[in-house]
Amino acid sequence: TPTAWQQYTDWQKEDKKIVKRINELIKSIDRDGLLEGIGKPEPLKYRKVCSRRITDEHRLTYNFDSNQNLIIYSCKFHYED
């Protein structure tokens, strides 16, 4: 999403380690599916998205669309706080 892309580009300026972690999480989603792999994946209640831990403070929220394309909703903060 545009929001997630903006957050990702912000991370590129702020913290390269976070960018590396986000990339690792995306690879895990691609390889392992929605709810398997690294980052403690979990479905979020009341929303049709899943979450993985980037850090204690930040989460990657995502899902697949009807064509099985990965959609990332956010990669900064904790469930869009």
Where are the model-predicted features located?
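Enriched for short, Lys/Arg-rich terminal
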Residues: 6-19, 38, 51-59, 63-81
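A short, surface-exposed loop/turn module that caps and links secondary-structure elements
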Residues: 27-53
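PIN/NYN-family metal-dependent endoribonuclease catalytic core
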Residues: 1-3
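Generic hydrophobic alpha-helical segments
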Residues: 8, 25-26
